[in-house]
Amino acid sequence: MAYNHFSIPKNIEEKENSFFDVTFQDEPDETTSTATGIAKVSIPTPKPSTPLSTLTNGSTIQQSMTNQPEPTSQVPPISAKPPMDDATYATQQLTLRALLSTREAGIIIGKAGKNVAELRSTTNVKAGVTKAVPNVHDRVLTISGPLENVVRAYRFIIDIFAKNSTNPDGTPSDANTPRKLRLLIAHSLMGSIIGRNGLRIKLIQDKCSCRMIASKDMLPQSTERTVEIHGTVDNLHAAIWEIGKCLIDDWERGAGTVFYNPVSRLTQPLPSLASTASPQQVSPPAAPSTTSGEAIPENFVSYGAQVFPATQMPFLQQPKVTQNISIPADMVGCIIGRGGSKISEIRRTSGSKISIAKEPHDETGERMFTITGTHEENEKALFLLYQQLEMEKDRRSH
C-alpha cells in the first residue's frame, strides 16, 4: 500500500489542479495561460518531523504505490535529511502560486500576452494565469521552475506592478513604494513558514524587513491559505526566497493539496452528505478544462508530490492505495456520527475502507483515520470527510 499522511483542515471541499494551456486574446482579462510544470524536489530521505509522506524501505511515493505493503497501525519511522546550502536550494524545483486581482492579472499578461511571454523567456520558468470569469475578481498565477528562477520571475512581476501603479498623491511609484503580494500556501505547509510559536515567520520578517500576514482560514473549497507580504520590491524579493526554501524543506507535506479555483464556488455546487445520491453523483468535481476542452490530468498535486490517476478503463483492476489522515480531536465525533451512522454512510458511498485509531497518535491529540481503496474511491471518501468537517464548522459558528 502507498501511504500518504496529512492533516485535514476544517473547511475542505474539493480538489482543484488548475493549470491552463496558453491562449492569448486581444483583451488581457480574457486571456488564458498556464504552467504545466509541476514542482518536484529530489530529496534523499524525508525528515522525521514530517508525517506527510509515510514511506517504507526508503522508497519514493511512486515506488511505494506499486509495491504496496499491508497497512499497519504505526506510522513507519523516517530518517532525517541533510541540510542544503543556498546553491542547492537555488536548483530545487518549486511551484509557487499567487492570488491576483483581475487588474493585476491583466498587467502580468500584457497586451496580446506580451508581458507573460517576456516573463517566461527572461526567467526560464513556466508561468500561467487562470482565465477570467464573469463576476469573479480573483485569478491565480502559477509559476514553476528552479527556486532561483521562480524568485526572479516574481521579482519581474513585482517590477511590472511598480511600473503600472501610482502613489496615492498621483505620482509614479518606484522600487521603494510599499506594495503587497498574496501567495497561496497549502494549509499543511503553513506551519513550515510560521514555525513553532511564530518564530520562523518572525525571523523572515526581520531578515527581509517586510511584514507578513498569514490567513487563519482556507480559501473556499480548497486547502490553500494566503500569506500576504508587505514591503518594497527588494523586501518582497528576499521574502519569496526564504518562503521558497521553507516549502522545499517540507515539500512532502504538500501532497493532497486541494487547489483554490476561483471558478469552483460558482460553477460546482457541493452535494449534501445526507442525500441519497449514488456514488457517481457525489464524486468529486472533474478536473478543470483548458480552452481546448481537454481535461487537465489529475495526477498533479502541489509542491512536487505525485499520485497515480485513476484508470479510465474499468475492466482493469485498479491498485489499492492507503492514506493516513489526522482529524482534530474535537471533530472526530461529527465524522463518526451517532452510532457510527455518518462514517458508515461515507464508507458505503465512497467504497473505501475507513478505520479509526482508538487513541491519539501524537501530542496534538489528533486521531488517525486510515482510508484504503482505489484512487477514485479515496477521492470520494476524502471529499465527503472534508464536506462533513465544513458542515460541522458552519454549525458551530452559528
UniProtKB/Swiss-Prot annotation:
Phosphothreonine modified-residue sites: T50
One of the protein's GO biological processes: negative regulation of p38MAPK cascade
SMART domains attached to this UniProt entry: KH
Species of origin: Schizosaccharomyces pombe (strain 972 / ATCC 24843) (Fission yeast)
Name assigned to this protein: RNA-binding protein rnc1
Entry's Gene Ontology molecular function annotations: mRNA 3'-UTR AU-rich region binding; mRNA 3'-UTR binding; mRNA binding
Classification via PANTHER family: KH DOMAIN CONTAINING RNA BINDING PROTEIN
UniProt PTM comment: Phosphorylated by pmk1. Phosphorylation causes enhancement of the RNA-binding activity.
Effect of G195D: Barely detectable binding to pmp1 mRNA. Fails to suppress the Cl(-) sensitivity of calcineurin deletion
Segments of this protein annotated with the region Disordered: 40-78, 274-295
Keyword field: Cytoplasm, Phosphoprotein, Repeat, RNA-binding
PROSITE patterns: KH_TYPE_1
Biased composition (Polar residues): 57-76
Pfam families: KH_1 (PF00013)
